[in-house]
Amino acid sequence: ELIKILESEKAYDGIMALHELKLLQYIIPELERGVGVEQSRHHVFSVFKHSVESLKHTPNKKWQIKFASLLHDIAKPQTKRMKDCYPSAGSGQVATFYNHDLIGAKVAAKIMSRLKFSKADTDKVVLLIKNHMFYYNVGEVTASSVRRLIRKVGEENLADLIDLRVADRLGSGVPKAKPYKLRHLEYMMEKVRFDAVSVKMLKINGDDLMKLLKIEPGPKIGAILDVLLSEVIEDQELNNREYLEKRSFELNKMDLKQLREQAKEKIEEKKMEDDEEIKKEYYVK
């Protein structure tokens, strides 16, 4: 029945009805503990209100993502601590919720086990909650750091994780759903995912060349691959085994220094062109 509520267009209304009828406390009592729990200064809503508002604004229609939105701050009540503000932030105290993401993932796992959800669904929701606080700074990000994030959460979960961040943001009463940094992350994901301009896209590799040309590992292998790649960039139809093998024999007999320099220029030019196209798609600079 809970899945039916989450799958519906009125999931928010359904959860609020359970809350108002005093039934939610018997299904997910951990969620009720957020009622009246205030957050830090930039949050408009209590923990409970923020949770249901996040559910309401989840852009993804899959019930697992909606459930992750509802439970993503489930551990905030138990992790709340008050500490003095830094002098630059004014006077008084501010609420902190250290490790609420990690603890919340464990709490969510217990909830879903208690409610007899499948292991696959539980793993999905838990992973999203555990990683919903991932750090991303446009000025510091690199392709390798994005690759690490992809390896950590799985490429198949990245779009869902971004949807959870959007739900979290809108559920805080912030009008702009997808800030620049999230659009920039999508751009970097696209860039890393395709990584199109690389010798890896060729239908031949270094091992193939060594066997074919009977040569030892060395810079000549890389030079031949670079030249082949530059030619394939110009004409994708050349990326076939027959042509690449024939052309490799020809290149093996040539002085490749100048050819490789020209190839590198062509490769960099193509990378920049592709990068600009992806940036336009996600409205980033």
Language model features with spans:
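Glycine- and charge-enriched loop/helix tracts that form the active or gating conduit
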Residues: 1-70, 74-99, 103-117, 193, ...
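Charged, alpha-helix-enriched surfaces in structured cytosolic catalytic cores
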Residues: 13, 49, 103, 141-144, ...
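A residue-level signal for conserved active-site and pocket-lining positions in enzyme catalytic cores
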Residues: 14-18, 54, 104, 129, ...
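Short polybasic/polar patches that bind polyanions
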Residues: 19, 113, 151, 210-211
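Core structural elements
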Residues: 23-24, 133, 215
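Histidine/acidic-rich helix-loop-helix segments that form or flank divalent-metal centers
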Residues: 33, 37-46, 52-56, 117-177, ...
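Active/binding-pocket-proximal capping segment
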Residues: 84-88, 102-103, 120-132, 146, ...
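Terminal helices and disordered tails flanking the catalytic cores of nucleotide-processing hydrolases
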Residues: 139, 148, 173-285
